[in-house]
Amino acid sequence: MSIWVKIKNMDNRDGAVVSVKVFDTQGQQGETVELNTQEEVEKLVHGSNKIVVEEVRQP
């Protein structure tokens, strides 16, 4: 499964909250994020302490 992440409100300060949206290439609406998916997002958005996933879209 391939996904890409749109990052909103990126802030590298300690304790910053990062909002991300995950889309498939067709922009289809997805389901609520699962723990393993959020861990993948955290790896993509490295260097951030907190991540808020607004939407998850998967193919």
Model-derived features: where do they sit?
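N-terminal acidic leader/helix
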Residues: M1-T32
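Intrinsically disordered, low-complexity Pro/Gly/Ser/Thr-rich segments with frequent PxxP/GP/PP motifs
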Residues: D24-K50
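Short intrinsically disordered terminal tails
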Residues: M1, Q58-P59
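A short, solvent-exposed beta-strand micro-motif common in secreted/extracellular proteins
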Residues: N49-Q58
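Detector for intrinsically disordered, low-structure N-terminal pre-sequences
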Residues: V17-S19, E40, L44, E55
